[in-house]
């Protein structure tokens, strides 16, 4: 402790000194705990009222929700955009108040200052004081092979998240910035929990997560299938099990379809993931808004040679210029694609048909891998709001006993069973709620409960 303080005091920037001192004290409290520390009182279940601040820190954004865990009610939510390049915060309360303003946010710490002000001051005020925030839960995209469940933040956890940045450079670096900014903004008495998108997929067997490249690349660099959208797949699959009357998951076979601008399909047996479409990165799987999905690896090297592209340029092409956008030439937004299809745009039709065909192949393969399927789940922006795509998928599997209820399938963003009562396989639209999963995990961990 003394050596740390001496080192810090040599730094001339006062702000850095304060941050480092807070951080050191925070880590000591996390490691040892004290009877009078409110954070540890939370963890011991001594708090009756609990409000959780859920954070999703991106490279230039910070999304948040404040959730009152008594009734699991969202008190307010918002988004800080264009961090480092100007700034805008949009803050919405549960009773309909909306506050939007341009404000300079040069880093995530400045963004947190705006979040604090939005929650406690002015027209968007929902709490009287920051002391009402019991804990903070962070969404983390990449947790590697190490994390198969959510954990309390400590020094090693932060370092591990930073170390996995090579597998998710745009995300994990921002997550670390978000955690450190939260420590600065809320002090050391507010415990923090991290919830990993990859954790739910850690039950996959090696035959599903290994790639057919030399084994040493797995040993040396962690090259394997990790899967993403795990928090979403976890929420909707657990909700589906409740609807099936089998909350423990035993004897069940589910296929969860998270369709958004980024999309993935996951096979779940007995409540545990056995396979998923995304791989080392969120680029794998079927064609998405601007992502290529799986392609012959030789296509990559061939284009690089022909175009003289660097690895970074090729990565940008596959992630930002491909998929529905690249094929249609119209947009990466599914609503624009649907409108273009309706207007007779042939390339938009091709993009639509390619994606649908690829999805159907994955679902069919997962039915075989599961040895059958009890229920199909549709979630996320497209899955919850695109009846035509859902209908096309279900009709394809009529031979397997899926029967679409045309009227119920017209639903947008509302939990609904969209198959008929005599369908041998049930299909549901289940709106996802990743923030609630993060809040629930955060509450459980600081109360000392097992996940």
What would you call each of these model-derived segments?
Residues 49-53:
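Extreme N-terminal starter segment of soluble prokaryotic enzymes
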Residues 61-105:
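Short glycine-rich, Thr/Ser-proximal phosphate-binding strand/loop in the N-terminal lobe
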Residues 118-133, 240-248, 363-374:
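Phosphate/pyrophosphate-binding loops at sites that engage ATP/ADP/AMP, CoA/4′-phosphopantetheine
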Residues 119-171, 191-193, 199-208:
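Short beta-strand-loop/turn "lid" adjacent to the catalytic site in phosphate-handling enzymes
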Residues 200-304:
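Glycine-rich phosphate-binding loop of actin/hexokinase-like ATP-binding domains
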Residues 260, 374-397:
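Glycine-rich phosphate-binding loops at beta-strand->alpha-helix junctions
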Residues 323-327, 334-369:
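Adenine-nucleotide phosphate-binding core of ATP-dependent small-molecule kinases
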Residues 387, 391-434:
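Conserved phosphate-binding/catalytic loops in two-lobed NTP-binding clefts
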């Amino acid at each position: 402790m003394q050596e740390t303080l001496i080192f810090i005091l040599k730094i001339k920037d006062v702000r850095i000194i304060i941050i480092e001192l807070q951080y050191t004290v925070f880590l000591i409290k996390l490691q040892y705990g004290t009877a009078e520390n409110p954070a540890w009182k939370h963890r011991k279940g001594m708090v009756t009222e609990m409000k959780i601040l859920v954070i999703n820190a991106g490279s230039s954004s910070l999304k948040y929700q404040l959730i009152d865990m008594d009734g699991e009610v969202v008190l307010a939510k918002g988004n800080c955009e264009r961090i480092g390049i100007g700034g805008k915060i949009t803050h919405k309360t549960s009773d309909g108040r909306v506050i939007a303003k341009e404000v300079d946010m040069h880093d995530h710490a400045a963004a947190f200052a705006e979040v604090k002000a939005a929650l406690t001051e002015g027209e968007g005020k929902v709490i009287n004081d920051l002391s009402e925030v019991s804990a903070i839960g962070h969404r983390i995209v990449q947790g590697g092979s190490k994390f198969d469940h959510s954990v309390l933040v400590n020094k090693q956890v932060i370092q591990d998240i930073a170390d996995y940045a090579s597998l998710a450079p745009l995300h994990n670096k921002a997550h670390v910035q978000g955690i450190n900014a939260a420590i600065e903004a809320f002090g050391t008495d507010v415990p923090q929990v991290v919830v990993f998108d990859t954790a739910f997929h850690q039950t996959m067997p090696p035959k599903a997560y290994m790639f057919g490249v030399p084994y040493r690349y797995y040993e040396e660099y962690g090259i394997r299938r990790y899967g993403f959208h795990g928090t979403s797949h976890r929420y909707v699959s657990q909700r589906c099990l409740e609807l099936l009357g089998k909350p423990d998951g035993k004897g069940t076979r589910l296929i969860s379809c998270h369709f958004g601008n980024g999309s993935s399909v996951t096979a779940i047996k007995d409540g545990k993931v056995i396979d998923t479409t995304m791989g080392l990165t969120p680029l794998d799987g079927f064609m998405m808004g601007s992502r290529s999905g799986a392609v012959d690896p030789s296509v990559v090297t061939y284009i690089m040679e022909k175009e003289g592209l660097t690895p970074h340029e090729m990565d940008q092409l596959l992630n930002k210029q491909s998929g529905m956008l690249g094929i249609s030439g119209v947009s990466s937004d599914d609503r624009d694609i649907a409108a273009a299809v309706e207007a007779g745009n042939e390339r938009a039709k091709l993009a639509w048909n390619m994606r649908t065909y690829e999805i159907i192949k994955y679902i069919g393969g997962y039915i075989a891998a599961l040895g059958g399927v009890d229920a199909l789940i549709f979630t996320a922006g497209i899955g919850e709001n695109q009846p035509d795509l859902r209908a096309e998928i279900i009709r394809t599997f009529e031979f397997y006993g899926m029967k679409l209820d045309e009227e119920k399938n017209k639903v947008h963003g509302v939990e609904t069973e969209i198959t008929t009562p005599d369908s041998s396989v049930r299909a549901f639209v289940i709106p996802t709620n990743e923030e609630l999963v993060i809040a629930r995990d955060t509450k459980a961990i600081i109360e000392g409960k097992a996940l």
